Structure formats: structure tokens, C-alpha cells
Amino acid sequence: MEDKNSVIVFKNVSFQYQSDASFTLKDVSFNIPKGQWTSIVGHNGSGKSTIAKLMIGIEKVKSGEIFYNNQAITDDNFEKLRKDIGIVFQNPDNQFVGSIVKYDVAFGLENHAVPHDEMHRRVSEALKQVDMLERADYEPNALSGGQKQRVAIASVLALNPSVIILDEATSMLDPDARQNLLDLVRKVKSEHNITIISITHDLSEAMEADHVIVMNKGTVYKEGTATEIFDHAEELTRIGLDLPFPIKINQMLGHQTSFLTYEGLVDQL
């Protein structure tokens, strides 16, 4: 049966890095809702980053299936489907390949043989969307970490993806740069109806999401809306996750509902 509301579906997926090693993922099944922000959270070793690698084809499943827009991903169709998915990694320096900003954004377009005039238009539009057009001629060493991640997002946007994966993309940023990047991602999602998948150990980032998948020891531990997940905060701490500051304060105040944003915390106080 077709699932028109999901862009990516994992069905009974298991994976191990070596044939004699233990399984990193064990019979994992979940749906990524189309056009929403899904956050996949877990501590180190939970399997969340392996999920990202499987989504973009760095690794292949050992058993089970992955579907993209109701098509089972195979060796024959993967390259075509992969063009719809962009990814932003943890370290901005490791993904900056151009000598200046605009060349970095153009790199992926060149690989797809996009005509020069269209390439110029797409680069300018993408940089404008992330507020980096005025820095188009800057070298990477002239940019902050947050600005480099904005360029990485522009490089993805220029390729017109349907899905953007953020693989710990905010973990090396200071709090202000982190929040600015999350605000940008929310804006991009809204304006382009793009599906966002954030892979993170940071539960405060999951508070931004429409849908949350909690991984633990290679299995799906919990799944639901942010409110549903954080209303059972004690279960998150039980598997070694650190609760966001507003939720910790909310618990100290003795309130029954665990989910609380920073804005909500201010109202409470």
C-alpha cells in the first residue's frame, strides 16, 4: 500500500559494519513525514548517524528495505533518487571545497552539468536565501562557523532538493550561531516545503521538530511529536540523554507537563 504522507520509510532495516561485528541497527522501522521536520536523536552509539549514511548511500542495508517516495531503493535507481537528498555535515571546514563562497555553492551544480547561466542564477538565489550573497567572494577563512554552515545549506539548496539532512550540523556552533542556523532551517522548510531530517544528540534541537524519533542501542526507543516525547522526560534520562534547560526548570517548578520552550519558560517565570 502506498504511503503518500511519507518521503522516506525504513522497513525492518538491520545493519552491521563488519560481518563479524554486532548489529548497529536492529530491525529498525519508521516513517519520515513529507514536508515536516523530523529529529532523530540518541546518544553516541545509538545508531542515528548510521541511519544518515544509509539514507545517502554511504552504506547499504544488510537486511530490510528503505523506500523513497514509495520506491524501494536499489542499486539501479539509487543515483536518481539520491539527487533529491542533500546533507549538511558536522564540521563546516570538511565540506568547504571551493576557494571562495560562490565557487563552493557552484561545485555541486558543475557536477550535475548545469548550464553556466542557470548555475549563476541558482548560486545567487541560494546565497540570497541564506543571507550570504554579500559574502559571495569571501574565502572560507574569513567566515565564522555559522556562516560556513549557511554556505553548506546554500550549496544544498542550489540543487533543489526535496529532503535536507542535518547530521550534527549545529554541534560545533556557539549557542547564538546554533539558534540562528535552526531559525534559517525553519525558514527554508517553510518557504520551499522541504523535508528536514536532523540527526543529533542535542535534545534542545529536537524541540524544534514536528516529529521525533529516539534511538537507543540500534533500535527505535520512542517516536512521536516533541510534546509526546518530552512528556516522558524520565525515559530520556534513563537512556543517557540530557534534557534541555527549559524542561529541567519546568520539572523543578513541579509542573506536570514536561515539554516547555524557552519562550514558555519565560512566561512561567
Curated annotation (Swiss-Prot):
SUPFAM superfamilies: P-loop containing nucleoside triphosphate hydrolases. GO terms for molecular function: ATP binding; ATP hydrolysis activity; ATPase-coupled transmembrane transporter activity. It holds the Pfam family ABC_tran. It is found in: Cell membrane. Its EC number is 7.-.-.-. It is a peripheral membrane protein. It comes from the Bacteria. CDD domains: ABC_cobalt_CbiO_domain1 (cd03225). Keywords: ATP-binding, Cell membrane, Membrane, Nucleotide-binding, Translocase, Transport. Residues 8-242 form the ABC transporter domain. InterPro entries: AAA+_ATPase (IPR003593), ABC_transporter-like_ATP-bd (IPR003439), ABC_transporter-like_CS (IPR017871), ABC_transpr_CbiO/EcfA_su (IPR015856), ECF_ABC_transporter_ATP-bd (IPR050095), EcfA_1 (IPR030947), P-loop_NTPase (IPR027417). It is an enzyme of class 7 (translocase). One of its GO terms (cellular component) is ATP-binding cassette (ABC) transporter complex. ATP binds at residues 42-49. SMART domains: AAA. ATP-binding (A) component of a common energy-coupling factor (ECF) ABC-transporter complex. Unlike classic ABC transporters this ECF transporter provides the energy necessary to transport a number of different substrates. Belongs to the ABC transporter superfamily. Energy-coupling factor EcfA family. Forms a stable energy-coupling factor (ECF) transporter complex composed of 2 membrane-embedded substrate-binding proteins (S component), 2 ATP-binding proteins (A component) and 2 transmembrane proteins (T component). This is Energy-coupling factor transporter ATP-binding protein EcfA1. It comes from Staphylococcus aureus (strain N315). The lineage of its organism: Bacteria, Bacillati, Bacillota, Bacilli, Bacillales.
